[in-house]
C-alpha cells in the first residue's frame, strides 16, 4: 500500500511552460532576464503571477513593501500557514530561473493539489517578495527583511 503522498507528482510540463511564459517578460542577454524591481517588466510579471494564482483559486494579498502573498486556505483555520516562494525581480543580467523558480514551484504545488482534489490542514501561501535583488533599491532582501522584522519600513 502506498504511503500518503507517495505518488504525488507535479506537472513538469506545466511548470516549464509557466517558466517560459514568465521568461518572455524582460528578456536579456544570453537567454536571461531583466525584470528589475518596480519597472514595467516587473509589473507585467507580477500581473501574470497574480492571474495564475487567481486561476488556481487563490486569494491574493498585497502587503507591506509590495510583497505578494497568494493564499490557498486549509481546513484548520487555527493551523499555522506554510509559506513557499521567492522573488520575481532580477538583476539587470539575471538568470532565467533565479527567484522565479521558487515562486512558480510554489504555484505548481497548489495547481497539483487542486488537480488531485487534495485539501491541506494548513493554509499554503505562495510568496513573491519585492526587491530581493536590491539592484535598484538597497539593501538586497529588503522586503523579506521587513516581513521578518530585520528592517523597518
Regions found by a protein language model. Give the residues of each.
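Alpha-helical metal-binding/catalytic segments enriched in His/Glu/Asp
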Residues: 22, 84, 93-132
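N-terminal capping segment at the start of a domain
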Residues: 2-39
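A non-catalytic alpha/beta surface segment that caps or lines the substrate-entry region
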Residues: 28-73
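A glycine-rich helix N-cap at a beta->alpha junction
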Residues: 124, 139, 143-153
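Catalytic-core environment of secreted peptidases
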Residues: 56, 68-101, 106
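N-terminal glycine-rich anion-binding loops that anchor highly charged ligand groups
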Residues: 14-28, 45, 60, 77-82
Amino acid at each position: 500500500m502506498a504511503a500518503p503522498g507517495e505518488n504525488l507528482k507535479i506537472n513538469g510540463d506545466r511548470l516549464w511552460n509557466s517558466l517560459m511564459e514568465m521568461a518572455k517578460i524582460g528578456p536579456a542577454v544570453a537567454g536571461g532576464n531583466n525584470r528589475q524591481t518596480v519597472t514595467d517588466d516587473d509589473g507585467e510579471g507580477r500581473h501574470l503571477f497574480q492571474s495564475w494564482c487567481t486561476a488556481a483559486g487563490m486569494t491574493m494579498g498585497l502587503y507591506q513593501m509590495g510583497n505578494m502573498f497568494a493564499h490557498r486556505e486549509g481546513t484548520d483555520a487555527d493551523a499555522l500557514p506554510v509559506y513557499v516562494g521567492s522573488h520575481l525581480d532580477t538583476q539587470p543580467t539575471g538568470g532565467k530561473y533565479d527567484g522565479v523558480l521558487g515562486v512558480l514551484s510554489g504555484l505548481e504545488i497548489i495547481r497539483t493539489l487542486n488537480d488531485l482534489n487534495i485539501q491541506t490542514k494548513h493554509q499554503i501561501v505562495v510568496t513573491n517578495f519585492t526587491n530581493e535583488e536590491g539592484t535598484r533599491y538597497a539593501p538586497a532582501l529588503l522586503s523579506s527583511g521587513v516581513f521578518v522584522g530585520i528592517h523597518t519600513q
